[in-house]
Amino acid sequence: IPWFQRRGIHNVTELAWWEESSLDTPDGPARVVALPARHWARRSLIADARRLWASWALILPSGNAIYFAGDSAYFPGFAEIGEHLGPFDASLLPIGAYEPRWFMQTAHMDPDEAVQAYADLGGRGTFVGMHWGTFRLSNEDPLEPPHRTRRAWAARNYPGEDLWILRHGETRTRRLTAPPPRNAGL
């Protein structure tokens, strides 16, 4: 929190995994839930893993919910998140920076694992592929992740219109419909 305060940002809430806070919206309070992820945190050359890394759920007053995986490897926690809060109307999942697997598998999922994570989260709604093609962080071709994700998606027979891999700078919107029956929560 001091980092934010030094920069003039004072309305900050720090959460541990499975803790939640609320965010005021014109339609009422939205729930913001900090959730597990599999990665590490480093904020300087010498301070390794002193801060918690997280994924997030945003549950709107309407009941619609969005999941943001952040930077994460695949791990069994996706199924637990899906059990408690899924399915989601949109899931933003990383699809890049995964080769070589022997080195990257503890920090970044590959496209097949991202589609598995989507299934674990409830397998419904829009899958938005992220964390690819901006910086060369690993050994795969920077344009490979979208192709591999589309193949993994098709192998599960998910609807093509639910897979969004945006071009750089692209914007899309999707009208949220009534939320699906959702698990009870925490």
Give the role of each language-model region:
Residues 8-11, 28-30, 158-162:
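A short helix-to-beta-strand connector/capping loop
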Residues 1-2, 39:
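A short acidic, glycine/proline-enriched capping/turn motif at secondary-structure boundaries
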Residues 2-3, 65, 73-167:
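Cap/insert and terminal regions of metallo-dependent hydrolase folds
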Residues 15-86, 151, 167-186:
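Core dinuclear metal-dependent hydrolase active-site scaffold
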Residues 3-16:
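Helix-loop-beta element that forms the nucleotide-linked donor phosphate-binding surface
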